[in-house]
Amino acid sequence: MSLTSRDGWWVPEVALSIILREVNDLKDMLPFCKQKRRVVQAGGNIGIWPKELSKHFDSVVTFEPDALNHQALVMNVGDVENIDIHNLALGEKYGAGSMDHIDPRNIGAHQIKDGDEFQIVSIDRFGYNDVDFLQLDVEGFEHFAILGAMETIQKSWPVICLELKGIGKRYGHPDEDTINLLESIGYTIRSRIHRDIVFVRN
């Protein structure tokens, strides 16, 4: 599959409209953020979310493990000064994985499987102490990404937005596990925006 230019974005030759529609939800998430220093975001996909976030936060750190999406991400937002791009997946600890493309027509419909196409790292590995927003749409891997971010979360108590759509159970953790994990450290659900759940610490 190759990249093509559509509506000013370099994208894999599949539908773009769904991502453009979902990014409009950001306006309902931002009011929960009292500060807007750093946002950690995954998956970066082709850059639509990171670019929009870069207009509101001092620094955007985005992660995208899929090779073709990462190529489009760099082409689309690689020149935006406050966006830091990583060709990595997020998890609980260091490892490696490969991408299983569930639906080739959907550039976000992937899942991680055993392999060595990319590295898996924890957010805590980066040592951030100024994260005000954590936004994760990692196709069922949210639970592991949160486990790998517990130190970071407890340093700055960011607003957390997760896309939870019931597919974490394929990795052994249904959505309830992730919700319970965040509630155990003082977070509550403040809003549900389509499939995104916004958590704020009491």
Describe each model-derived feature in a short phrase.
Residues 1-81, 128, 178-181, 188-202:
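S-adenosyl-L-methionine
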Residues 2-26, 81-129:
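Glycine-rich adenosyl-binding loop in Rossmann-like folds that engage adenosine-containing cofactors
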Residues 66-69, 89-93, 166-168:
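Short "lid" loop at the C-terminus of a central beta-strand within the Rossmann-like core
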Residues 78-81, 100-106, 152-153, 176-181:
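Short, hinge-like loop/turn segments at secondary-structure boundaries
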Residues 44, 90-92, 138, 164:
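Hydrophobic pocket-lining residues within nucleotide cofactor-binding pockets
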Residues 33-40, 100-110, 131-142:
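Mobile, glycine- and charge-enriched loop segments
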Residues 37, 56-62, 124-202:
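Conserved acidic-Pro-Pro-aromatic motif
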Residues 53, 73, 99, 145-149:
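Hydrophobic packing residues within well-ordered alpha-helices of enzyme cores
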